[in-house]
Amino acid sequence: MRPRKRFGQHWLTDQQILDEIVAAANLQPTDRVLEIGPGKGALTSRLLPQVEALLSVEIDRDLCKYMVKNYGDRPNFLLLEADYLQTDINEFLGDFPQFQNPRKVVANIPYNITGPILEKLLGTIDRPNSNPFESIVLLIQKEVGDRLVAHPCTKAFGALTLRVQYLADCETVCVVPPKAFYPKPKVESVVVRLRPRPLAQPAQNPKLLATLIKVGFASKRKMLRNNLKSLYNPEILDPIFADLDISPQARGEEVDLLQWIALSDRLNDYPKE
């Protein structure tokens, strides 16, 4: 059985990296875990002995047959043949109470759908996941992983950074070279761990914050003030920027998350143009 390009399949074969992914999940015997895209079960085989229940979601019908043949007799394993992005797993689990409400996620996901999967797992700034996971360990493209953990004033810092860091703490576990996969991808990969959590001081108007971030990074070469002029008069923006110690020449990537939240809270008192 060969990986299918249309599903973005690259199977992880490096045993050390597989062990690092499982270690990063910090599994307990009572854990219920969600695995997205199990492939041929390289991670599955390591997860099953350590958890109470493992729900694996796989879109590839042939791989589902393979997984059922090799793991279908395990009492703590349940396979759902479905597109994770289009499926409400809770609807499927009504007759399987042992697998309901998984609290941890471990997955080697197709790189071309990383953004949508992150959004489904975490929610959005204005609509966060109402039942957040305890931890999410993902193997993703390094370029995207760098953006998740980026700091202000760096090239990787951007809208995705803010959207994810508003909802979760993010850290890099390890870098994964192309040779760790079959077939080899053309890019480096990285294992990241996300721990969803509420902010101590969330935005007063999360929808406005999401809008500001979108507009603020609409043209990264422009100064933030100039991007936001499409929403607010400079007479409103300038004194607020000064109060928040944001330079009039600052670009979006030079403003940290707390400053973005403070900016949103201040602008919440004014109608958009």
UniProtKB/Swiss-Prot annotation:
InterPro entries: KsgA/Erm, rRNA_Ade_diMease-like_C, rRNA_Ade_Mease_Trfase_CS, rRNA_Ade_methylase_Trfase_N, rRNA_adenine_dimethylase, SAM-dependent_MTases_sf. It comes from the Bacteria. PROSITE patterns: RRNA_A_DIMETH, SAM_RNA_A_N6_MT. Keywords: Cytoplasm, Methyltransferase, RNA-binding, rRNA processing, S-adenosyl-L-methionine, Transferase. GO terms for molecular function: 16S rRNA (adenine(1518)-N(6)/adenine(1519)-N(6))-dimethyltransferase activity; RNA binding. S-adenosyl-L-methionine binds at H10, L12, G37, E58, D83, N108. Belongs to the class I-like SAM-binding methyltransferase superfamily. rRNA adenine N(6)-methyltransferase family. RsmA subfamily. This is Ribosomal RNA small subunit methyltransferase A. The lineage of its organism: Bacteria, Bacillati, Cyanobacteriota, Cyanophyceae, Oscillatoriophycideae.
